[in-house]
Amino acid sequence: MEKGKIIAIDGFSSTGKSTIAKAIARELNFLHVDTGAMYRAVTLYGIQENIISENDKENALQIVNHLDEIQITFRYNESENQNEIYLNGQNVENEIRSISVTNLVSYVAKIPEIRSFLVEQQRQLAWNHNIVMDGRDIGSVVFPQADLKLFITADAQVRAQRRFNEMEDKSETTLEEVKANLIQRDELDSGRENSPLVKCDDAIEIDNSNVSQEELMENIMRIVQSKI
């Protein structure tokens, strides 16, 4: 087996990482892997099995005892033209975007054993695949030797509106609550002891605050084509 080309995309929550990664993957015919979805799937498992809840966030450590019961896979959905995530054989692409998962995922993602469990799976995907992988530690931990590293940023208000628009049931929360949650997640992601979110020295920073999708992708594809 050979390792393919790797494009690593990191950044804070709701900066548009996955949208950018999907677009690059389609353009280059690479495999797209949303690692944030993998952490969300583990979090969803914890909720479904009554291991963690809003009132018992710190119980997330108990999920470590159930990792051998968790199988995460990606399958291509032709009608949506994207890879979708499956948890133990069930499509959970929509369920992992719920506010309950959003509020708990950072507590799950900071646990070293869970990160190691998922990082190993992420590295395996690079064998015999050219991939675009987005997350928070792709360039720094998962693939420090990636062929190209991008770090995506965006204004907090823009990010909050983007996340709010993604939610199917907006009655669950308000825009201001979403923004507060994002800021809290930023602090958790940057401050965790294991694999904190950092911008690598060799990463190219892209601001996705107030730019059209067309202009953004034209700029990014120029960078990609010069590096890959």
Predicted regions and their residues:
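ATP-dependent NMP and nucleoside kinases share a basic, alpha-helical "lid"
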Residues: E93-E168
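Hydrophobic anchor at the beta1->P-loop junction of P-loop NTPases
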Residues: I9
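Conserved lysine of the Walker
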Residues: K17
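Hydrophobic positions on the alpha1 helix immediately C-terminal to the Walker A/P-loop
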Residues: I20
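Small-molecule kinase domains that catalyze NTP-dependent phosphoryl transfer to phosphate-bearing small molecules
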Residues: H66, N77, Q122-H129, R136, ...
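Walker A (P-loop) ATP-phosphate-binding motif of ABC ATPase nucleotide-binding domains
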Residues: I6
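The conserved Walker
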Residues: S13
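N-terminal phosphate/diphosphate-binding loop that engages ATP/GTP or pyrophosphate donors
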Residues: E27-I96
